[in-house]
């Protein structure tokens, strides 16, 4: 039973991380890393590369954000993102998206075929 729960949590984390990477890639936002600007697909590549490097330390989506998408390992400077003219830290932006992902998953888990009123 415990193994099943652990596996289920890992699967959920893997899905959340994949969802966040896709969100970054499709965002159309500009990412600022160490003063340089990168488009969304390039940012996704960089975050995925860091994720692969830190994978053994990452057990939650929050740890994924912390290790892979928060700040430069070299300079310590926080990553920033600019979407529609508004800037924020990439950490705040991704944590907000993670909340949306989890809310969507919870809503989908509570829907059942018996509740379908289209008949």
Residues covered by each model-derived region:
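Compact alpha-helical subdomains of small soluble proteins
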Residues: 35-119
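Sec-dependent signal peptide recognition
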Residues: 1-2
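N-terminal secretory signal peptides
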Residues: 11-53
């Amino acid at each position: 039973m415990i193994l099943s729960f652990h596996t289920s949590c890992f699967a959920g984390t893997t899905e959340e991380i994949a969802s966040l990477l896709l969100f970054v890639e499709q965002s159309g936002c500009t990412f600022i890393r160490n003063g340089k600007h990168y488009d969304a697909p390039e940012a996704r590549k960089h975050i995925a590369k860091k994720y692969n490097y830190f994978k053994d330390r990452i057990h939650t989506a929050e740890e994924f954000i912390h290790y892979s998408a928060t700040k430069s390992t070299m300079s310590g400077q926080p990553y920033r993102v600019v979407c529609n003219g508004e800037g924020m830290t990439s950490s705040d932006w991704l944590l907000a998206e993670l909340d949306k992902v989890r809310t969507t998953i919870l809503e989908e888990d509570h829907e059942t075929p018996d509740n379908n009123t289209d008949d």
